[in-house]
């Protein structure tokens, strides 16, 4: 895989010099440039991720754990996803924003998938949705694609089915399971997915699946043989310490830095060194004297301070 012509250098078409990446750009990246994808859950994080040059932003249902403090992703609602997706879209100019369809918003049938997918796509402004699994949800994938809603697939460890899988375990370690994963990947490609996430899959298996697909794969715990990589932003920045998956590389310790900053702020507030003169606003001497004279005229005295 070469390193020329990244999607992020696509010819700008907007008046401000950038344009949003499309599914066509993502497809064209296969075999040309690895794709960088990260999660974002609000306007500020989207601005950071987009401004740093990520190709795709995933508004994942992982927000249930990372942002809302829940134990898993299963309780995240469509309304919650819409709330976060809108904020992310507002903070993004170039990266392609993809939204997870929450648990039980598509598994119950084609009609539900279309109604919920259309609402998520139309009301939030995301440019694609992501569904987990294959088999039973293939009709939903086809229906969404036929309706004009781009779909990203997700195979391997699928967090919405973690209970069924017996926990967070690597998938595809047996030959039969690896072949089943490959067949599912082909089925999702044929159903119209423009790309595919492979999560917690042995690296050699993910590499071979990637080499036999026409659509790009994006790995998370699936080795360097995928066409791109995705991580949870809060994991790679050291902001979320409840879980520490093996596949996460921590690029910063922002939780530590933030904790030190907050502690320093609290200390300065308590000792009276913040705010300093440069952080405050003054008043004309004459106006202040007039203000004090008015207070004295009213007989307003200072309240005694505590011991």
Swiss-Prot record:
Keywords annotated in UniProt? Cytoplasm, Magnesium, Metal-binding, Pantothenate biosynthesis, Transferase
Q: Which cysteines are joined by disulfide bonds?
A: none
Cofactor binding summary note? Binds 1 Mg(2+) ion per subunit.
Please tell me where this protein is predominantly located.
cytoplasm
In terms of CDD domains, this protein maps to: KPHMT-like (cd06557)
The keyword Lipoprotein appears for this protein: no
Explain the purpose of this protein: Catalyzes the reversible reaction in which hydroxymethyl group from 5,10-methylenetetrahydrofolate is transferred onto alpha-ketoisovalerate to form ketopantoate.
Q: How does it assemble?
A: Homodecamer; pentamer of dimers.
- This protein is called what? 3-methyl-2-oxobutanoate hydroxymethyltransferase
Phylogenetic classification of the source organism: Bacteria, Pseudomonadati, Thermodesulfobacteriota, Desulfovibrionia, Desulfovibrionales
């Amino acid at each position: 895989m070469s390193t020329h012509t990244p999607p992020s250098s696509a010819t700008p078409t907007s008046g401000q010099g950038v344009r949003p990446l499309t599914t066509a750009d993502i497809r064209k990246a296969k075999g040309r440039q690895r794709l960088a994808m990260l999660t974002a859950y609000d306007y500020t994080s989207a601005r950071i991720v987009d401004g740093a040059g990520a190709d795709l932003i995933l508004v994942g249902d992982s927000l249930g754990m990372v942002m809302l403090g829940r134990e898993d992703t299963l309780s995240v609602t469509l309304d919650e996803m819409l709330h976060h997706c809108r904020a992310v879209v507002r903070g993004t100019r170039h990266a392609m924003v993809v939204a997870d369809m929450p648990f039980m918003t598509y598994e119950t049938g084609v009609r539900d998938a279309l109604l919920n997918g259309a609402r998520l796509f139309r009301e939030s402004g995301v440019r694609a949705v992501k569904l987990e699994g294959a088999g039973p949800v293939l009709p939903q994938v086809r229906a969404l694609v036929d309706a004009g809603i781009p779909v990203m697939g997700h195979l391997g460890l699928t967090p919405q089915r973690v209970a069924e899988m017996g926990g967070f375990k690597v998938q595809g370690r047996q030959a039969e399971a690896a072949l089943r994963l490959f067949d599912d990947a082909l089925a999702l490609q044929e159903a119209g997915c423009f790309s595919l996430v492979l999560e917690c899959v042995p690296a050699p298996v993910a590499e071979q699946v990637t080499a036999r697909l026409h659509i790009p794969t994006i790995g998370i715990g699936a080795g360097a043989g995928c066409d791109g990589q995705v991580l949870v932003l809060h994991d790679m920045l050291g902001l979320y310490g409840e879980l520490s998956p093996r596949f996460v590389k921590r690029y910063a310790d922002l939780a530590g830095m933030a904790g030190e900053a907050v502690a320093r702020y609290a200390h300065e507030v308590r000792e009276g060194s913040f705010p300093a003169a440069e952080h405050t606003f003054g008043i004309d001497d004459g106006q202040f004297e007039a203000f004090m004279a008015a207070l004295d005229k009213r007989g307003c005295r200072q309240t005694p301070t505590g011991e």
